[in-house]
Amino acid sequence: MLDHIGIDVQNYEKSKAFYKAVLAPLGYELIMEVQGWAGFGVGGKPDFWIQGGKQTIPRVHVAFRSDNRERVRSFYEAAINAGAKDNGPPGIREMYHPNYYGAFVIDLDGHNIEAVCHNPE
C-alpha cells in the first residue's frame, strides 16, 4: 500500500500555489512545510509532497482518486486556470474499465497529473 509520494519541482513557490489551487477540488490542502518540502493531503495527513529547486527529469505520472466525477471536472478546470496544459479532458477512459472517469494535465514542470473517479455516474 502506498503511503506517500514526493516529486521535484523547479520553482517551489509557484508549484506550491499551483498545487494548492489544483488539489483543493479533491479535498486536499497544504498541511505542512518541512525543510524545503510542502506536504498536501486530506484529513491532516500529507501524502503528496513537492520539493523545490530540483531538476524535474524524469517526469512522473501521479493520479489522485476522487469520489465523484464533479470533483474530477473541478480539478481539471482549476488546473487549466492555474497554468497547466491539457493532457486529456474529463471523460470516460473505457480502455481501463467502463467507469474510469479521468482528467489529465501537465503541471508547471511537465509532470502528468491526473484526477480519476472509478464510480459510476
Give a label for each model feature.
Residues 1, 55-58, 97:
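Short glycine-enriched loop/turn motifs at secondary-structure junctions
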Residues 1-16, 62, 119-121:
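N-terminal beta-strand motif that seeds the catalytic metal site of vicinal oxygen chelate
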Residues 7-47:
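Core segments of cupin and vicinal oxygen chelate
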Residues 11-13, 64-109:
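Vicinal oxygen chelate
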Residues 27-29, 49, 86-90:
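A short linear hydrophobic-aromatic micro-motif
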Residues 40-81:
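Long, continuous compositionally biased terminal/linker segments
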Residues 112:
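Glycine-rich acetyl-CoA-binding "A-motif" of GNAT/NAT acetyltransferases
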